[in-house]
Design a protein with these regions (language model features):
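Short, well-ordered alpha-helices that flank and scaffold nucleotide-derived cofactor binding pockets
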Residues: 26, 119, 123, 168, ...
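Alpha-helical elements of Rossmann-like donor-binding domains used by nucleotide-donor carbohydrate transfer enzymes
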Residues: 23, 116-120, 202, 206-209
């Protein structure tokens, strides 16, 4: 154990178990850490945590998505680590003081979110949403022709972690994938053809499926 660093304080707002808290404590080493997250919120994506005023005054780092207006109540804040991939609301002028570092959870959601996207695509192709809506009324009418993804083309707008995961799932069922990103020279797993945003209008006509994974979507 080194010297206890009383000039730093991490306020952790995540809904952690005791064993997870222990892992954060070990990772922080000699920097003190206060846990204010509610473990009963596990399984929900609307995590909220009440940060006491005395901790706001001392916090040099916050882990979690505090309300943007609370950032101004943390005068010593040097680092905000969100649990979300999107951080748009913290990037508005006046939210974080100059010099504060903002990091996100990019890379944590690629598999789970892309699986949800794929499930929605599959449901639409197979008319599952129509059959599900008919179920409570005991209506078993034919919803029309189902579509196979095999041989179809998916246009993936935004090929970061989530977009590239989705492209790989599409490839696994026989789809051709076209990816769009700011720098088309950078390849992404699962993408057959990469183009820039300036070519979007040119390829829309070839897409059977359009999936978006860009900021604020």
């Amino acid at each position: 154990m080194g010297i206890w660093n009383d000039r730093k304080l991490i306020v952790n707002c995540l809904p952690l178990t005791e064993s997870e808290r222990a892992q954060f404590i070990r990772a922080a080493k000699d920097i003190p850490q206060e846990f204010v997250g509610d473990s009963t919120q596990r399984g929900s994506m609307s995590w909220t945590a009440a940060v006491p005023e005395e901790l706001k005054a001392k916090a040099t780092a916050v882990i979690g998505n505090i309300a943007p207006e609370e950032c101004a109540q943390c005068p010593k804040l040097e680092w905000l680590q969100t649990w979300s991939a999107g951080v748009d609301k913290y990037q508005r002028p006046g939210i974080l003081q100059s010099g504060s570092m903002l990091t996100n959870a990019t890379g944590a959601y690629g598999q789970s979110v892309s699986e949800h996207m794929f499930a929605m695509m599959w449901a639409i192709m197979k008319n599952l949403h129509i059959y599900a809506a008919s179920n409570p009324n005991a209506m078993w009418q034919d919803a029309g022709r189902a579509i196979s993804p095999n041989g179809k083309t998916a246009l993936v707008i935004g090929t970061g972690d989530i977009g590239s995961h989705f492209a790989r799932l599409c490839k696994n069922v026989g789809m051709t994938t076209i990816g769009i990103r700011r720098n088309p020279a950078v390849e992404a797993p699962g993408v057959d053809h990469m183009i820039g945003f300036d070519s979007l209008d040119d390829v829309l006509q070839y897409a059977d499926v359009i999936a978006m994974s860009v900021p604020s979507t």
